[in-house]
């Protein structure tokens, strides 16, 4: 086997591992966002009382006030390509299960701030 083939095989192995790790981070973050939506956003009376609707689709949580029409931007919380949580175009970093409560509270703080609750 030539040196070029050896290097190529090493690179291919590293890339496969990195891709697997990225998909795992993305899966963890998506599961967290789904749980956050189901347990904290969907049943929230505060959001309902203030006319804020929420939808979850394709690893995106979208919160908006329908009565504001198209004049007010919705708040997007998304799972990024590398498994990070992004809110309003700003990254909150990768999700780690050990930081679940802290990440939830950070998201809740951002929602409160965005909608002036």
Locations of the language-model features?
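N-terminal functional modules and adjacent low-complexity/disordered segments of proteins
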Residues: 3, 42, 56-58, 87, ...
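Generic intrinsically disordered, low-complexity segments enriched for polar/acidic and small residues
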Residues: 5, 17, 29, 33-34, ...
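Mixed-charge, Lys/Arg-enriched low-complexity segments
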Residues: 1-16, 24, 98-117
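Negatively charged, low-complexity tracts enriched in Asp/Glu with abundant Ser/Thr
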Residues: 8-64
């Amino acid at each position: 086997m030539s040196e070029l083939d050896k290097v190529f095989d090493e690179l291919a192995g590293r890339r496969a591992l990195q891709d697997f790790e990225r998909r795992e981070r993305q899966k963890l973050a998506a599961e967290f966002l789904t749980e956050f939506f189901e347990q904290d956003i969907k049943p929230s009376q505060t959001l309902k009382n203030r006319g804020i609707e929420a939808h979850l689709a394709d690893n995106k949580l979208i919160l908006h006030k329908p009565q504001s029409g198209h004049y007010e931007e919705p708040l997007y919380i998304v799972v990024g390509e590398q498994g990070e949580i992004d809110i309003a175009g700003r990254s909150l970093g990768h999700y780690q299960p050990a930081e679940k409560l802290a990440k939830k509270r950070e998201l809740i703080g951002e929602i409160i701030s965005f909608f002036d609750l």
